[in-house]
């Protein structure tokens, strides 16, 4: 009876924000743009902790914390819509990957600090917050990869 009550009373938007729905969106867009789903999941975890309604002090919003100009450039009209946000965020990440010739550290630094900053400074001018961001995403990415290996019956040793 409780399940029926929850399904009837929850707004439709809440059903579209289930973790399994978000994981499906991540998997789909990651594959479309040639990324490992765990990388996109790691960015989401670091950027918003999976909160579809997250807003930063700088004005970034949604799961992948898109700034208004970035969202507009990649066709995202509603930054709080998980499907649009993930699609736009992954498309932006692919653009950054191409801009920085596949260098993941520069790609992630640019996702965090902006591509203009990285084009000007690269990682030669260490910015503690930017380096910490890149390291945090890399750490979460590795953790998620190991979790997948274990879930699929592999061994961590």
Predicted regions and their residues:
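N-terminal signal peptide c-region/cleavage motif recognized by signal peptidases
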Residues: 9-11
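Positively charged n-region of N-terminal signal peptides that target proteins for export
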Residues: 1-4
């Amino acid at each position: 009876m409780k399940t029926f009550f929850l399904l009837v009373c929850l707004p439709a938007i809440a059903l579209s924000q289930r973790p399994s729905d978000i994981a499906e969106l991540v998997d789909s867009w990651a594959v479309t743009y040639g990324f490992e789903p765990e990388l996109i999941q790691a960015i989401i975890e670091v950027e918003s902790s999976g909160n579809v309604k997250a807003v930063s002090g700088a004005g970034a919003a949604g799961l992948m914390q898109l700034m208004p100009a970035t969202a507009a450039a990649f066709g995202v009209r509603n930054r709080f819509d998980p499907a649009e946000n993930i699609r736009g965020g992954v498309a932006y990440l692919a653009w950054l990957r191409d801009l920085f010739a596949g260098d993941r550290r520069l790609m992630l630094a640019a996702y965090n600090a902006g591509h203009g900053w990285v084009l000007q400074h690269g990682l030669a001018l260490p910015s503690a917050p930017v380096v910490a961001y890149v390291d945090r995403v890399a750490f979460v990415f590795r953790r998620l990869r190991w979790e997948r290996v274990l879930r699929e019956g592999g061994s961590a040793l």
